[in-house]
Amino acid sequence: VLPGAIDKAIYVAFKPNDGTVCRVYSLDYDETVELNLHGEKPSQQWACYVYGVCQEMEKRGALILPFDMAFGGDVPLGAGLSSSAALESAVGFALNETYGLGFDREQLAKIGQMTEHNYVGVRCGIMDQFASLFGEAGHVIRLDCRSLEYKLEPFDPQGCRVVLFDTQVKHTLASSEYNVRRAQCEAGVAVVLRHVGGVESLRDVTADMLDTYKGEMDEVVYRRCRYVVDENQRLLDACAALEKGDYVTFGQKMNGSHEGLSRQYEVSCDELGFLADIGHRTD
């Protein structure tokens, strides 16, 4: 994957308290929740991220004492900019620094990922958390999500500017089709694995393999898998273009990614398609 950090952030104010519960205030929701770290998870979804980070740290041997916390920031909520990962990372940093827990950034990324799995119900990957914790200005991150090896690729398109549009269409991964898409991809992998050994995920699958066993897959499953396989190759081509300073080719690969997300993976929307069409027509 090839994520990058942006100039938006979530900020945490944090201090230990002498009580028996944690008090957490969300500026965005203007709501305070009391957390019992040895009790049930909270009913408010935003508070589950804080609770989950604490639980995942304690699973790894940390002792989390009661605290007071307030957080807010300028990362748009539900806009596809990984506000949940930013919150997990900020909370993780605050706890790690205050209590001297000794977790490194890779461990904090895994803690954030497992928070989503175990306390929010989203079987997410690790890209969003990794981008929040490892992103640097003027670079994108070429990340191998299996080994977690990564490389910072310079990103400085002279004469161009990257513009992020807010479609005003809100979503949450917890209530979106994310888990459905993941299950569809896993179904495709299972078909290929019946014939080809050593296949663990779609990164091990080629387009030829998919075409060979297409008849054993649901048509929708094939489309989902084909998008991922094609996107993996687009990423490699895009990185090669970046290393040459070829931002025209890089932009063409980005256009291909949008097309695949819209038509094959079907996770776009009319509003986003409208904005993409305007971008394509603009020199």
Regions found by a protein language model. Name each.
Residues 1-85, 89-105, 110-114, 119, ...:
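ATP-binding N-lobe of GHMP and related small-molecule kinases
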Residues 6, 11-44, 139-283:
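C-terminal nucleotide
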